[in-house]
Amino acid sequence: MKLQTLLSRLPGFWVHRGGNPDIVALEMDSRHVTPGSLFFCVKGFTVDGHDFAEQAVERGAVAIVAERPLSVNVPVVVVPDSRRAMAILADAFYGQPTHRLHLIGVTGTNGKTTTTHIIEQVARKAGKKIGLIGTVGTKIGDRSYPAVNTTPESLVLQRTFKQMVDEGVEFVTMEVSSHALHQGRVHGCDYDVAVFTNLTQDHLDYHGTMEEYRNAKGLLFAQLGNRYDERRPKFAVLNHDDPVSQYYKHMTAAPIITYGIKEKSDVMAEQIEMTPGGMAFQLCTPHGTMAIETKLVGLFNVYNLLAATAACLASGFSLATIAEALANVSPVPGRFETVDEGQNFTVIVDYAHTPDSVENALKTVRQFAKRNVYVVIGCGGDRDRTKRPLMAQAAVRYADVAVFTSDNPRSEDPRQILRDMEAGVSAGDGTYVTIPDREEAIRYAIGQAQEGDVVLIAGKGHETYQIIGDDVIDFDDRAVARAAVKERR
């Protein structure tokens, strides 16, 4: 594709040192540049792509997109924001692939992964070839690929959409993070349905305030319905029990479908009961009411099931197909996943890493724990420090014993992270011990557990690594827990 043809889709730019070369690839990492590439100079948290423009040209880049003129001997397209320009041009370069897909985006603090996986399983039950993008990874049909970010950079994202189209995928569900929305990674994505799960404290290290965090999530709904196509009606699916939905309701031009348990909503759950194998409830929708039994547990999962149901109804699936799929939904790896080696106590690994999700997970555990509840919990380094004492408070309040430990400390001193957590606990709040080494902490909790107890290992879920300093080491909470249980025999 000629550079000028590609740039015809881009507003607000000027070209320093003109030319119209053929563009055969798009790259933002100078190490991956090949002859004929258009290189994007993107500012990151630790490096600035502008510093690598010369290296990109040496490797064969025939044009550069940057936020200032550069001294290189190829055309430089100067834009206000390289990352947003990259998203727009990636969409154009790969032929606007989302215009040929039914695309559902799910945003919110908690529940994105489970909701997208439920939607995926409903679509499979309906016979669709499905694509999925999120925290656990990317799926194209029956193949899975590991994830780097919850929502990939736009070059990877649009390239993935193009691959999905080429392989006959017709239906895609994806997690949309606040970072991706704020950075414009999903510019050009043509969403058919946008889903809001909930909003609780997280990522304030990046957004600064809850208001800014809320606004970033709202960008998904602000762009929904801006491109009118009577053949592809758009829908916003909102959690009516979360007051933030009222804000998003006024941000979108799309029709709204609400779901909830407390407030009167379009899609509701009534008569919710815990069962030996999961939960049962009455699913009430504009298309009728059906009795649902599911293997999932916890009120938070009722919300996830309702969100997925509303999104699937908006996508044209029948209530009967949805109900059949919900009855057979498989748990998501690392989301309330049990470690069962025949022991007489329960071990659960969960991704809960916000104050709200820790509280919800422990409240759910309380519903079936016969004796004591232990929770192993840490907080990530180089992330929102203000949530650390709040997570510790939730842990000691809802567990009998909390074990504070490391999560992914990254560049921070693990002991300082633990001190930040301990600052949230006052005398008399509850019982906790501090064990910085995560493996030791897991082994301690499992070693203390007796018949009827529950051990909840929170924070990392499906992750198979731990980041300590610059090192990424193999670490899987599930594997460590399994080994610890076996050693008790």
Swiss-Prot record:
Swiss-Prot/TrEMBL catalytic activity: UDP-N-acetyl-alpha-D-muramoyl-L-alanyl-D-glutamate + meso-2,6-diaminopimelate + ATP = UDP-N-acetyl-alpha-D-muramoyl-L-alanyl-gamma-D-glutamyl-meso-2,6-diaminopimelate + ADP + phosphate + H(+)
Cofactors that this protein relies on: Mg(2+)
InterPro entries per UniProt: Mur-like_cat_sf, Mur_ligase_C, Mur_ligase_C_dom_sf, Mur_ligase_cen, Mur_ligase_N, MurE/MurF_N, UDP-N-AcMur-Glu-dNH2Pim_ligase
Keywords: ATP-binding, Cell cycle, Cell division, Cell shape, Cell wall biogenesis/degradation, Cytoplasm, Ligase, Magnesium, Nucleotide-binding, Peptidoglycan synthesis
GO CC aspect terms: cytoplasm
Pathway per the UniProt entry: Cell wall biogenesis; peptidoglycan biosynthesis
UniProt-listed Pfam families: Mur_ligase, Mur_ligase_C, Mur_ligase_M
Keyword Ligase (UniProt): yes
Record carries keyword tRNA-binding: no
Family (UniProt): Belongs to the MurCDEF family. MurE subfamily.
Protein name (Swiss-Prot/TrEMBL): UDP-N-acetylmuramoyl-L-alanyl-D-glutamate--2,6-diaminopimelate ligase
Organism: Geobacillus thermodenitrificans (strain NG80-2)
